[in-house]
Protein backbone atom coordinates (compact mmCIF):
# COMPACT_ATOMS: atom_id res chain seq x y z
CA UNK A 1 0.00 0.00 0.00
CA UNK A 2 2.79 2.42 0.91
CA UNK A 3 4.16 2.78 -2.67
CA UNK A 4 0.75 4.02 -3.86
CA UNK A 5 0.56 6.95 -1.41
CA UNK A 6 2.47 9.48 -3.57
CA UNK A 7 0.19 8.79 -6.52
CA UNK A 8 -2.87 9.21 -4.28
CA UNK A 9 -1.58 12.56 -3.09
CA UNK A 10 -0.92 13.68 -6.66
CA UNK A 11 -4.43 12.72 -7.77
CA UNK A 12 -5.94 14.53 -4.78
CA UNK A 13 -3.92 17.64 -5.53
CA UNK A 14 -5.05 17.60 -9.16
CA UNK A 15 -8.69 17.28 -8.08
CA UNK A 16 -8.35 20.25 -5.74
CA UNK A 17 -6.73 22.35 -8.46
CA UNK A 18 -9.43 21.45 -10.97
CA UNK A 19 -12.22 22.31 -8.52
CA UNK A 20 -10.57 25.60 -7.64
CA UNK A 21 -10.04 26.50 -11.28
CA UNK A 22 -13.64 25.62 -12.09
CA UNK A 23 -14.90 27.91 -9.35
CA UNK A 24 -12.72 30.71 -10.65
CA UNK A 25 -14.06 30.26 -14.17
CA UNK A 26 -17.66 29.95 -12.97
CA UNK A 27 -17.59 33.16 -11.02
CA UNK A 28 -15.49 35.16 -13.47
CA UNK A 29 -12.71 35.97 -11.02
CA UNK A 30 -9.52 34.50 -9.62
CA UNK A 31 -10.93 35.29 -6.15
CA UNK A 32 -13.39 32.41 -5.91
CA UNK A 33 -13.48 32.86 -2.12
CA UNK A 34 -15.46 36.07 -2.68
CA UNK A 35 -18.55 33.90 -3.29
CA UNK A 36 -20.39 32.18 -0.45
CA UNK A 37 -23.50 30.07 0.03
CA UNK A 38 -23.84 30.81 3.75
CA UNK A 39 -24.79 34.26 5.03
CA UNK A 40 -22.64 34.48 8.14
CA UNK A 41 -23.87 37.73 9.69
CA UNK A 42 -27.16 38.39 11.49
CA UNK A 43 -28.93 41.71 11.10
CA UNK A 44 -30.46 43.06 14.30
CA UNK A 45 -32.25 46.38 14.00
CA UNK A 46 -34.88 48.05 16.20
CA UNK A 47 -38.44 48.20 14.93
CA UNK A 48 -39.02 51.78 13.76
CA UNK A 49 -41.75 53.57 11.77
CA UNK A 50 -41.02 53.80 8.05
CA UNK A 51 -42.28 55.36 4.82
CA UNK A 52 -41.62 53.89 1.36
CA UNK A 53 -41.19 56.09 -1.72
CA UNK A 54 -41.76 54.31 -5.04
CA UNK A 55 -39.10 55.27 -7.61
CA UNK A 56 -39.22 52.37 -10.07
CA UNK A 57 -36.35 50.10 -11.12
CA UNK A 58 -34.58 52.39 -13.60
CA UNK A 59 -36.73 51.22 -16.48
CA UNK A 60 -35.33 54.05 -18.63
CA UNK A 61 -31.77 52.79 -17.97
CA UNK A 62 -30.25 55.95 -16.51
CA UNK A 63 -26.59 54.91 -16.32
CA UNK A 64 -23.34 56.87 -16.34
CA UNK A 65 -19.78 56.80 -15.03
CA UNK A 66 -20.22 60.09 -13.16
CA UNK A 67 -20.51 60.76 -9.44
CA UNK A 68 -22.34 64.02 -8.69
CA UNK A 69 -21.70 63.64 -4.93
CA UNK A 70 -18.00 62.73 -4.86
CA UNK A 71 -16.76 64.10 -8.22
CA UNK A 72 -19.08 66.94 -9.28
CA UNK A 73 -18.13 68.58 -12.55
CA UNK A 74 -15.88 65.69 -13.63
CA UNK A 75 -17.33 63.52 -16.43
CA UNK A 76 -16.46 59.82 -15.98
CA UNK A 77 -15.10 60.72 -12.54
CA UNK A 78 -16.42 57.51 -10.96
CA UNK A 79 -14.28 55.21 -13.15
CA UNK A 80 -17.16 52.74 -12.92
CA UNK A 81 -20.81 52.84 -13.95
CA UNK A 82 -23.62 53.89 -11.63
CA UNK A 83 -27.30 53.00 -11.80
CA UNK A 84 -29.82 55.70 -10.86
CA UNK A 85 -33.41 56.00 -9.76
CA UNK A 86 -35.18 59.24 -8.99
CA UNK A 87 -33.92 62.43 -10.59
CA UNK A 88 -33.62 61.92 -14.36
CA UNK A 89 -30.92 64.54 -14.89
CA UNK A 90 -28.31 63.40 -12.35
CA UNK A 91 -24.79 63.43 -13.78
CA UNK A 92 -21.44 65.17 -13.36
CA UNK A 93 -22.93 68.52 -14.41
CA UNK A 94 -25.71 68.47 -11.81
CA UNK A 95 -26.25 71.47 -9.56
CA UNK A 96 -28.87 72.11 -6.92
CA UNK A 97 -30.80 74.24 -9.39
CA UNK A 98 -30.64 71.72 -12.24
CA UNK A 99 -31.76 68.88 -9.97
CA UNK A 100 -34.65 70.93 -8.60
CA UNK A 101 -35.85 71.68 -12.15
CA UNK A 102 -35.65 68.12 -13.51
CA UNK A 103 -38.29 65.37 -13.67
CA UNK A 104 -38.06 62.25 -11.52
CA UNK A 105 -39.04 58.59 -11.59
CA UNK A 106 -40.19 58.86 -7.96
CA UNK A 107 -43.75 59.32 -6.77
CA UNK A 108 -45.06 62.19 -4.64
CA UNK A 109 -42.81 64.74 -6.30
CA UNK A 110 -39.57 63.39 -4.81
CA UNK A 111 -36.80 64.81 -7.03
CA UNK A 112 -33.96 63.15 -5.11
CA UNK A 113 -31.28 61.05 -6.80
CA UNK A 114 -30.35 57.60 -5.50
CA UNK A 115 -27.52 55.65 -7.13
CA UNK A 116 -25.05 52.75 -6.74
CA UNK A 117 -22.60 50.72 -8.91
CA UNK A 118 -24.13 48.46 -11.54
CA UNK A 119 -24.07 44.67 -11.21
CA UNK A 120 -22.93 42.68 -14.25
CA UNK A 121 -23.01 39.16 -15.63
CA UNK A 122 -19.32 38.75 -16.39
CA UNK A 123 -19.71 35.96 -18.96
CA UNK A 124 -21.42 38.34 -21.39
CA UNK A 125 -20.10 41.34 -23.32
CA UNK A 126 -21.38 44.66 -22.07
CA UNK A 127 -22.66 47.60 -24.12
CA UNK A 128 -19.73 49.63 -22.76
CA UNK A 129 -16.92 47.14 -23.31
CA UNK A 130 -14.75 49.88 -24.83
CA UNK A 131 -16.02 52.85 -22.84
CA UNK A 132 -14.98 54.82 -19.76
CA UNK A 133 -16.46 53.32 -16.62
CA UNK A 134 -16.91 50.01 -18.43
CA UNK A 135 -14.29 47.88 -20.13
CA UNK A 136 -11.72 50.68 -20.27
CA UNK A 137 -11.68 50.66 -16.47
CA UNK A 138 -11.80 46.87 -16.09
CA UNK A 139 -15.56 46.64 -15.58
CA UNK A 140 -16.55 44.03 -18.13
CA UNK A 141 -19.84 42.25 -18.56
CA UNK A 142 -23.50 42.80 -19.33
CA UNK A 143 -25.29 45.15 -16.92
CA UNK A 144 -28.08 43.43 -15.01
CA UNK A 145 -31.38 45.26 -14.65
CA UNK A 146 -32.74 45.34 -11.10
CA UNK A 147 -35.83 43.28 -10.37
CA UNK A 148 -36.79 45.57 -7.50
CA UNK A 149 -35.71 48.79 -5.79
CA UNK A 150 -37.08 49.82 -2.40
CA UNK A 151 -36.50 53.35 -1.10
CA UNK A 152 -37.42 53.40 2.59
CA UNK A 153 -37.14 56.19 5.14
CA UNK A 154 -37.11 55.14 8.79
CA UNK A 155 -37.61 57.03 12.03
CA UNK A 156 -35.44 56.90 15.14
CA UNK A 157 -36.00 54.18 17.75
CA UNK A 158 -35.33 56.63 20.59
CA UNK A 159 -36.64 60.07 19.57
CA UNK A 160 -38.47 62.16 17.03
CA UNK A 161 -36.57 63.09 13.86
CA UNK A 162 -35.94 66.45 12.24
CA UNK A 163 -36.38 67.07 8.49
CA UNK A 164 -33.40 66.31 6.28
CA UNK A 165 -31.94 69.53 4.87
CA UNK A 166 -32.69 69.91 1.18
CA UNK A 167 -29.69 69.15 -1.07
CA UNK A 168 -27.85 67.20 1.62
CA UNK A 169 -25.38 64.77 0.04
CA UNK A 170 -24.71 61.35 1.53
CA UNK A 171 -22.55 58.31 0.84
CA UNK A 172 -22.59 54.93 2.52
CA UNK A 173 -20.03 52.18 2.11
CA UNK A 174 -16.41 52.37 0.98
CA UNK A 175 -15.64 52.15 -2.75
CA UNK A 176 -11.99 51.58 -1.73
CA UNK A 177 -12.72 48.86 0.84
CA UNK A 178 -10.33 46.37 -0.79
CA UNK A 179 -7.27 48.62 -0.68
CA UNK A 180 -8.39 50.00 2.69
CA UNK A 181 -8.31 46.45 4.09
CA UNK A 182 -12.06 46.46 4.71
CA UNK A 183 -11.83 49.37 7.15
CA UNK A 184 -14.53 51.08 9.24
CA UNK A 185 -16.35 52.69 6.30
CA UNK A 186 -17.08 49.27 4.77
CA UNK A 187 -20.83 48.76 4.96
CA UNK A 188 -21.54 46.34 2.10
CA UNK A 189 -24.54 44.14 2.81
CA UNK A 190 -25.41 41.31 0.43
CA UNK A 191 -28.24 38.88 1.07
CA UNK A 192 -30.84 36.49 -0.35
CA UNK A 193 -34.58 37.11 -0.29
CA UNK A 194 -35.23 33.66 1.18
CA UNK A 195 -32.90 34.31 4.15
CA UNK A 196 -34.28 37.44 5.83
CA UNK A 197 -32.21 38.95 8.60
CA UNK A 198 -28.93 37.45 7.39
CA UNK A 199 -26.24 38.98 5.20
CA UNK A 200 -22.60 38.87 4.10
CA UNK A 201 -19.98 41.24 2.71
CA UNK A 202 -19.23 38.69 -0.03
CA UNK A 203 -21.17 37.73 -3.16
CA UNK A 204 -24.03 35.45 -2.06
CA UNK A 205 -25.00 32.41 -4.10
CA UNK A 206 -28.77 32.60 -3.74
CA UNK A 207 -29.82 29.89 -6.19
CA UNK A 208 -33.34 30.67 -7.41
CA UNK A 209 -33.90 33.33 -4.73
CA UNK A 210 -33.53 37.05 -5.43
CA UNK A 211 -30.07 38.46 -4.67
CA UNK A 212 -30.23 41.59 -2.49
CA UNK A 213 -27.93 44.57 -2.00
CA UNK A 214 -28.83 46.80 0.95
CA UNK A 215 -27.60 50.28 1.85
CA UNK A 216 -28.12 52.10 5.15
CA UNK A 217 -27.20 55.77 5.32
CA UNK A 218 -26.19 57.88 8.30
CA UNK A 219 -28.98 59.64 10.16
CA UNK A 220 -27.29 61.98 12.66
CA UNK A 221 -26.82 65.45 11.16
CA UNK A 222 -24.43 68.12 12.44
CA UNK A 223 -27.19 70.73 12.14
CA UNK A 224 -25.30 73.00 9.74
CA UNK A 225 -23.86 71.40 6.62
CA UNK A 226 -25.24 69.67 3.55
CA UNK A 227 -21.83 68.23 2.61
CA UNK A 228 -18.30 67.83 3.97
CA UNK A 229 -14.85 67.14 2.55
CA UNK A 230 -15.21 63.41 3.18
CA UNK A 231 -18.94 63.45 2.32
CA UNK A 232 -19.39 61.65 5.66
CA UNK A 233 -18.68 63.82 8.71
CA UNK A 234 -21.71 66.12 8.34
CA UNK A 235 -24.08 63.13 8.72
CA UNK A 236 -22.87 60.18 10.79
CA UNK A 237 -24.33 56.90 11.99
CA UNK A 238 -26.15 56.53 15.31
CA UNK A 239 -24.60 54.84 18.31
CA UNK A 240 -25.52 51.32 19.41
CA UNK A 241 -29.11 51.56 20.59
CA UNK A 242 -30.06 54.22 18.06
CA UNK A 243 -29.20 57.49 19.82
CA UNK A 244 -27.21 60.11 17.92
CA UNK A 245 -23.71 61.14 19.08
CA UNK A 246 -23.38 64.42 20.99
CA UNK A 247 -23.87 67.60 18.95
CA UNK A 248 -25.74 65.76 16.18
CA UNK A 249 -29.47 65.59 15.49
CA UNK A 250 -31.63 62.67 14.30
CA UNK A 251 -32.98 62.87 10.75
CA UNK A 252 -34.82 60.19 8.75
CA UNK A 253 -32.66 57.16 8.05
CA UNK A 254 -32.53 56.23 4.36
CA UNK A 255 -32.47 52.52 3.59
CA UNK A 256 -32.22 51.30 -0.03
CA UNK A 257 -32.60 47.65 -1.09
CA UNK A 258 -31.94 46.52 -4.67
CA UNK A 259 -32.93 43.03 -5.84
CA UNK A 260 -31.71 40.99 -8.84
CA UNK A 261 -32.69 37.68 -10.39
CA UNK A 262 -29.31 36.09 -11.19
CA UNK A 263 -29.46 32.76 -13.05
CA UNK A 264 -27.92 30.05 -10.86
CA UNK A 265 -24.29 29.38 -11.74
CA UNK A 266 -23.82 32.55 -13.78
CA UNK A 267 -20.79 34.70 -12.86
CA UNK A 268 -21.51 38.21 -11.60
CA UNK A 269 -19.67 41.17 -10.09
CA UNK A 270 -20.19 44.84 -9.27
CA UNK A 271 -18.33 47.69 -10.91
CA UNK A 272 -15.41 49.16 -9.00
CA UNK A 273 -12.21 51.14 -9.36
CA UNK A 274 -9.70 48.95 -11.22
CA UNK A 275 -7.46 48.58 -8.16
CA UNK A 276 -10.41 47.38 -6.05
CA UNK A 277 -10.67 44.16 -8.08
CA UNK A 278 -14.50 44.24 -8.07
CA UNK A 279 -14.43 43.13 -4.45
CA UNK A 280 -18.02 42.81 -3.14
CA UNK A 281 -17.06 44.67 0.05
CA UNK A 282 -16.58 47.84 -2.05
CA UNK A 283 -20.34 48.13 -2.58
CA UNK A 284 -21.60 51.63 -1.82
CA UNK A 285 -24.36 54.10 -2.66
CA UNK A 286 -24.92 57.84 -2.86
CA UNK A 287 -27.89 60.14 -2.38
CA UNK A 288 -28.82 63.79 -2.86
CA UNK A 289 -32.00 64.90 -1.13
CA UNK A 290 -34.08 67.01 -3.53
CA UNK A 291 -37.45 66.43 -1.87
CA UNK A 292 -39.58 69.56 -1.80
CA UNK A 293 -39.68 70.95 1.74
CA UNK A 294 -43.41 70.19 2.06
CA UNK A 295 -42.89 66.53 1.13
CA UNK A 296 -40.03 66.12 3.62
CA UNK A 297 -42.17 67.76 6.31
CA UNK A 298 -45.01 65.31 5.62
CA UNK A 299 -42.61 62.36 5.68
CA UNK A 300 -41.26 63.48 9.07
CA UNK A 301 -44.81 63.96 10.36
CA UNK A 302 -45.65 60.38 9.44
CA UNK A 303 -42.47 58.98 11.00
CA UNK A 304 -42.91 60.89 14.24
CA UNK A 305 -46.68 60.35 14.37
CA UNK A 306 -46.21 56.57 14.29
CA UNK A 307 -44.00 56.53 17.37
Model-predicted regions and their roles:
Residues 16-28:
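Hydrophobic alpha-helical membrane-insertion segments, chiefly the h-region
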Residues 28-79, 83-215, 222-307:
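Primary mode marks residue(s) on the alpha4-beta5-alpha5 output face of response regulator receiver
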Residues 1-14:
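N-terminal export and membrane-targeting signals
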Residues 8-11, 21, 30:
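N-terminal cationic amphipathic segment used for targeting or macromolecule association
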